[in-house]
Amino acid sequence: MNLRSIITARHIQNAPFWQIVWEWEDAIASYLRLPLVKQQPYLFGSKATKLDRLLFRPCVFPYSEFLLGQSDLPALRFHINPPWVHGYHTRSNVVPIVIDCWRNELHRIPVMFRRQKAIFVCNLEAVNILKASEPLLPIHYLPVSLPESDIPNEIPQKDIDILSYGRTHPDLVQWGHQFASEHPEVRFCWIGTHEGRPVWYEKGQKTEMGSSRQALMQVLARSRIVLQSSPGMHAQEFERTGGFSPVTPRFFEAAAKCCHMVGIYPENDEFRRLRIADICQRVTTYSEFHDEVKRLLITRFGTNELTRNQAFLRANTTERRAEDIIRVLQLS
């Protein structure tokens, strides 16, 4: 079984975290020669009407699919989280890829996707729980990735010593500041948000930076060491994720820009399976952090490290994920 298209929401979603999804869609579409089709979420606009809610109720679904037409070949659709309401994007001939699925969202997977031929989830902890609790549900693990075009051929010039960005563990941020205060010659920068816009911070000064993914990747290319962490590793994040700590695309992004990495992350099945320890040094105390950062600052990122990162990224390209999707569908 093949796919007929990829349903994209890029015309109705503009949040920065969707940008990597568009890259995945483009890479899969190019590799499998599939068209990108704009999502039409509901019958009369971008919000669900009473008719939509009736038409896409599970008990009415078989009739709505008959009325709306059904293709023999399924389409692919990315979801940041499991959807809350039924729509065109949850029909049985749409194969979902759910990127973030936290513990308190698990129940929505069987509710929304019970009639799918295959369901892909990018969080191994969630997949294992769903397989145990819903053994008849066609759940499959699909790790996050980067397109093959992001594999580096050379090492970029570096002028930032330590970079923190995204949802970094607060201990890492504190340790970064402490290290910079103890070593004034070190250039420590971090990317946060101000009034919803990405902001670059350095020595108490903030500068607005572009919200494009290209702007972020350019900063990564300039960074020697990137601080990494997984969701769910401190109290606030634990509450948000229910303790789930998946591998995020940030590890792949920093690997693509030839950065050393120091991080706080679990030694769970997903991190071991993807061999994150090969590219990111795990620390648990400031003493370990200090020694590791100090060592990496004087360790040149050379050809051995470049070769290692190339191998890591080749094993985790979006194109390989596309092959995995087709392989699963052919067996479904």
Regions found by a protein language model. Give the residues of each.
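Active-site donor-binding loop signature of nucleotide-sugar glycosyltransferases
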Residues: 99, 144, 167, 283-285
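Active-site proximal beta-strand in glycosyltransferases
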Residues: 75-81, 87-102
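A charged, aromatic-enriched C-terminal amphipathic alpha-helix characteristic of glycosyltransferases
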Residues: 284-287, 294-331
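Nucleotide-sugar donor-binding catalytic core of glycosyltransferases
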Residues: 2-64, 71, 79-85, 104-107, ...
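Short catalytic-loop micro-motif centered on adjacent basic/acidic residues
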Residues: 75, 96-97, 163-165, 312
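Pocket-edge positions in alpha/beta enzyme catalytic cores
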Residues: 208, 246, 281, 313-314
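Short amphipathic alpha-helix with an adjacent loop that forms part of the alpha/beta core around
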Residues: 65-69, 87, 292-296
